[in-house]
Design a protein with these regions (language model features):
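Active-site and adjacent substrate-binding regions of carbohydrate-active enzymes
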Residues: 103-118, 126, 143, 160
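Alpha-helix N-cap and loop-to-helix initiation/capping positions
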Residues: 28-32, 93-97, 101, 147-158, ...
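Aromatic-lined substrate-binding rim segments of carbohydrate-active enzymes
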Residues: 7-56, 141-170
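Aromatic-lined carbohydrate-recognition surfaces of secreted/lumenal glycan-active proteins
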Residues: 45-62, 119-126, 150-201
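Active-site-adjacent "subsite" loops/lids of carbohydrate-active enzymes
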Residues: 35-42, 52-112, 200-203
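Catalytic domains of carbohydrate-active enzymes, especially glycoside hydrolases
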Residues: 1-11, 112-117
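Aromatic- and acidic-residue-enriched segments that line the glycan-binding/catalytic groove
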Residues: 11-25, 59-86, 123-144, 189-196
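Conserved, mostly hydrophobic/aromatic
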Residues: 1, 44, 102, 109, ...
Length: 205
């Protein structure tokens, strides 16, 4: 069972880093009276099933959602590692501290819960962002002679590698997986051109 433990800067477990999602109670940060992730893990294991924590990696939601999270939003706590783009907020894949922030979240889950795996969704750049995605400053600092597209692909790979190594250092038996776009690159045999992992969202994993 893949259980969504993190949505967009809010969570479905007792966290010291990000607030409880309002989905369960109607109020951001309100404890629902039980720990949803702990419940899922326990019930899965009773039935001989694995339980994996599904984590939405980079999207943080729109302005209204981010505002609703208040002071516990990462946009408020660590604005340097976030980017606003098309009325949405994202963790900035090009900032070195982003992978450390994500590792804190993952460590909290892996150390405190008997999960069998951690799964990352939306570990990608917004679709067809091109030069409109405002990461020019980071590219100037950290690009090191690479093209913008290559740098972005490397950023995502570096994040995933860092998280994988961190999980395996804590609990080698915990599985690490991700949800890349299903089509790696365009091919001449198919009519669906332009929507792919490699160019459209800079995934090379």
């Amino acid at each position: 069972v893949l259980f969504q433990a993190r949505t967009r800067g809010d969570v479905f477990y007792r966290s010291k880093i990000e607030p409880f999602s309002a989905i369960l109670t109607g109020s951001v940060g309100k404890d629902p009276g039980y720990d949803p992730l702990a419940f899922v893990v326990e019930e899965c294991h009773k039935r001989g099933m694995e339980s994996h924590a599904w984590i939405v990696a980079l999207p943080l939601g729109g302005r209204k959602h981010v505002t609703s999270l208040g002071a516990r939003s990462v946009v408020k706590k660590q604005p340097a590692i976030t980017i606003s783009y098309k009325r949405e907020y994202f963790l900035d894949p090009g900032h070195p501290d982003t992978k450390e922030y994500m590792m804190k979240l993952v460590r909290e889950v892996v150390e405190n819960y008997d999960v069998d795996g951690v799964h990352f969704d939306y570990l990608r750049y917004p679709e067809h962002a091109g030069t409109r995605f405002p990461d020019t400053r980071g590219f100037r600092i950290y690009g090191k002679g690479r093209s913008l597209a290559a740098w972005r692909r490397d950023n995502l790979t570096d994040i995933l590698r860092h998280l994988y190594k961190g999980v395996k250092a804590m609990k080698p038996w915990v599985k690490v997986s991700t949800s890349p776009v299903g089509k790696y690159d365009d091919t001449s045999r198919y009519s669906s051109q332009g929507w792919n992992a490699y160019d459209a969202v800079h995934q090379d994993v």
